[in-house]
């Protein structure tokens, strides 16, 4: 009897290297303080790339467009017209 051992398909596929499998670390952008929250001067309010939100009253803008409080007070997110937003910090009145 004649025994035929024919293989038409590879039993082992060739193993190549992948070019995937990398990802950058998240930059943790976005709001760091909420509307109505009390903050101290120097507190970071919003981390962003570009000016998604503009600095308002008592708010400064850092070199990487981070918004920070210049004084102690309460955070307020406000609208500027139809398509702009700003964040302001209003000092709390001191009771004597």
UniProtKB/Swiss-Prot annotation:
Entry-linked SUPFAM superfamilies: Ribosomal L27 protein-like (SSF110324)
Q: Which residues form the propeptide?
A: 1-9
Q: Which Pfam families match?
A: Ribosomal_L27 (PF01016)
Spans annotated as Disordered = 13-35
The organism sits in which domain of life?
Bacteria
MF terms in GO: structural constituent of ribosome
Q: Name one GO biological process term.
A: translation
Keywords from UniProt, A to Z, are: Ribonucleoprotein, Ribosomal protein
- UniProt family annotation: Belongs to the bacterial ribosomal protein bL27 family.
NCBIfam families, from UniProt?
Answer: L27
Quote the protein name from its UniProt record.
Large ribosomal subunit protein bL27
| Species, as recorded | Bacillus cereus (strain ATCC 14579 / DSM 31 / CCUG 7414 / JCM 2152 / NBRC 15305 / NCIMB 9373 / NCTC 2599 / NRRL B-3711)
Task: Print the organism lineage.
Answer: Bacteria, Bacillati, Bacillota, Bacilli, Bacillales
């Amino acid at each position: 009897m004649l025994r035929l051992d024919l293989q038409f398909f590879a039993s082992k596929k060739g193993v190549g290297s992948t070019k995937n499998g990398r990802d950058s670390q998240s930059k943790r952008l976005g709001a760091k303080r909420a509307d109505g929250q009390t903050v101290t001067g120097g507190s970071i309010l919003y981390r962003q790339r570009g000016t998604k939100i503009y600095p308002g009253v008592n708010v400064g803008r850092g070199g990487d467009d981070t918004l920070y409080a210049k004084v102690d007070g309460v955070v307020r997110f406000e609208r500027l017209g139809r398509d702009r937003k700003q964040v302001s910090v209003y000092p709390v009145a001191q009771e004597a």
